[in-house]
């Protein structure tokens, strides 16, 4: 688990750079301005959480369930949030919007919020 978390963080980071470049160059002509902004939001959130996963992976000892749950929230939440945005944007650009992905984005966002809340709780619990 200790090496898996920074590995996933690095993978998410690498994919964020690839998707960001793809969006900025290849999709700029295909996407509307709103679709491009949505796609960029997915890329930004993916990169933020990729960096966070690398940092947590090297700083957590994974001796508690709380640390494990925090990391799972960020891994799963990032995947659901960002990749559902990519799917929505790409499908809409092709004229076939995958409506099933619509509810997945806020679920991913909620899981990210839970991860941040658990991380905050872990800091407060250490102080108290």
Regions found by a protein language model. Give the residues of each.
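Juxtamembrane loop-transmembrane helix junctions in multi-pass integral membrane proteins
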Residues: 1-4, 31-40, 59-69, 93-103
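Core segments of alpha-helical transmembrane spans in multipass integral membrane proteins
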Residues: 11-21, 37-62, 75-83
